[in-house]
A protein has these predicted regions:
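Membrane-embedded helix-loop-helix hairpins and adjacent transmembrane boundary segments
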Residues: 1-511
């Protein structure tokens, strides 16, 4: 067992915080009068709270884990991810790219836009199904990341961690099922404040403990110039940087959880302000955890630590599960009792914040865009809320099972980017062409969605299943190469099929 400072006092702090979040869910349940309040908080989200909840849901434990893992694996070169995310978000905020037209249309989900724009209910159902499947797979390893964090920072064994994580997701289900988007927004705000303070204090203590010059020299000793320049790093390169910019646009303008907040905004002006100010948060949510990951790298390197983070030659471990554990183990050894509990509470609360947002998002997509359109009659608000709550429970059960057996095989961030690409490569083509090109048709949209599914070949286990691993390795084809290629083909397919099979006049809504 790895050494940690985690004590009984820290457990009390964490427990008290988690109980408080459940009380919030019970309290806001009285404000839920219909599906609009449950899914998009009655479209009453103002600028300041919108910024906090947008950053709060994205600044989760999973974000901290995969960002810290990238800092540990790539050094300061990993900072390009946050920089690309910040630039992409501010561009979306200034231009209103995609999100402003969606808010004007008054849609609650992206598949709902498919039907309004192209006049095809079947397209909405098909698109909603792909979105939900990709989204659920995308968050499939969130529980594993949470389990690794809890075991690393507290020192408890793996079997006990499984029960702790199961209890946590049950708490998430309770207040999300009761309060919907209103409880999500309120808890996101609280967790945003707690986690932000906790991470900043951690950075200060880490620099005081290690020293800035030691950090720079340590990264140089481990990675040389590759630890500072992403364009020459073997694991990164120019194509990966371009992929990160594209992911930055997707994260804020196409990914359903962010779009839900744009749709919940009070007005178009609020949407733009949310994105402009959130751009700093989208950047910092990567930079701070990456910096902590770099601190962990140098800390364990200077200690002369070998197992489990380094091999006998001083090389960083290539086991993704091991490198992901570096940050929580580092926190457990760095922070004093009490402060460690506060930071752990903030991190675990952030884990819950991400889960409540994503669970509600994918359950609502299945309800609004798959099951409800399949009905011969329109479901009542009461029926839709009941179905959404049922789906929340079923998705949570799947996540527990998936997180226990899926072999990671690559950095968590790369897994999330590729699994999300199953949806967003096609969706980006449909949104961009559909919103800004009048001739975009339903046939083109179908082709983009179908082509986008091929992004699944960026996942290692899929390559192994189809015996393609040797081909990908021999040709040095990585997940981001697959994602960029599929995105280009999806846009091309959208254009070709739209020109070849145009929509009939009058079967779509004007943008």
């Amino acid at each position: 067992m790895l050494e940690t400072n985690f004590s009984a006092l820290d457990w009390v702090i964490v427990g008290a915080y988690l109980v408080g979040t459940v009380i919030i869910g019970l309290w806001v349940n009285r404000y839920i009068k219909g599906m609009g309040e449950f899914l998009v908080a009655g479209r009453s989200l103002k600028t300041r709270l919108g910024i906090a909840t947008m950053i709060g849901s994205e600044l989760g434990l999973v974000t901290a884990m995969f960002a810290a893992q990238k800092g540990f694996s790539d050094g300061f070169a990993a900072f390009h991810i946050g920089l690309m995310a910040g630039i992409a978000t501010i561009i979306v905020g200034l231009t209103g790219f995609i999100v402003v037209p969606l808010r004007r249309m008054g849609v609650m989900t992206i598949p709902e836009y498919y039907e309004k724009r192209f006049g095809s209910r079947n397209l909405r159902i098909f698109g909603g199904f792909i979105l939900a499947v990709a989204g659920i797979l995308n968050m499939g390893l969130f529980l594993k990341a949470g389990a690794i964090f809890v075991s690393g920072i507290t020192g408890i064994d793996g079997e006990a961690v499984k029960w702790v994580m199961t209890a946590m997701i049950i708490l998430v289900l309770i207040y999300t099922c009761l309060g919907g988007m209103i409880s999500v927004i309120i808890t996101d705000y609280v967790q945003f404040v707690v986690l932000s303070i906790g991470l900043l204090v951690t950075c200060v203590i880490a620099v005081q403990k290690i020293g800035w010059s030691t950090l720079v020299k340590g990264v140089d000793a481990i990675y040389s110039d590759q630890g500072f320049n992403p364009f020459i790093a073997e694991s990164i390169g120019g194509s990966y940087v371009a992929w990160m910019f594209f992911i930055g646009v997707i994260s804020c303008a196409v990914w359903q959880t962010a779009v839900m907040r744009a749709c919940a905004a009070e007005s178009v002006e609020v949407v733009k302000k949310m994105y402009i100010w959130s751009s700093l948060g989208f950047m910092i949510r990567f930079l701070i955890p990456q910096f902590i990951g770099i601190c962990a790298l140098v800390y364990f390197f200077d200690m002369g630590s070998t197992q489990p983070f380094f091999d006998g030659q001083g090389q960083v471990s290539n086991d993704s599960n091991v490198t992901m554990k570096a940050m929580p183990v580092f926190l457990g050894q760095l922070l004093p009792v009490g402060l460690l509990g506060i930071v752990a509470a903030g991190m675990i609360a952030a884990f819950m914040s991400t889960h409540d947002t994503y669970l509600l998002c994918w359950a609502s997509v299945l309800t609004e865009d798959v099951f409800n359109p399949l009905k011969s009659y329109k479901m009542s608000d009461k029926q839709r809320i009941l179905l959404t709550r049922t789906l929340l429970i079923l998705i949570a059960a799947f996540l527990v099972m998936w997180g226990l057996w899926y072999p990671l095989g690559q950095d968590l961030w790369d897994y999330m980017a590729v699994s999300g690409a199953i949806y967003f490569t096609g969706a980006f083509a449909i949104l961009m062409m559909g919103l800004y090109w009048e001739k975009a048709s339903a046939a083109g949209a179908y082709s983009a969605l179908i082509i986008g599914i091929f992004a699944v070949f960026g996942l290692r286990p899929v390559q192994e299943f189809f015996s393609l691993e040797e081909f990908f390795n021999k040709n040095e084809i990585l997940g981001h190469h697959v994602g960029l290629t599929v995105s280009c083909f999806a846009i091309g397919g959208m254009i070709i099929m739209s020109v070849s099979f145009p929509n009939k006049e009058g079967n779509s809504e004007k943008i």
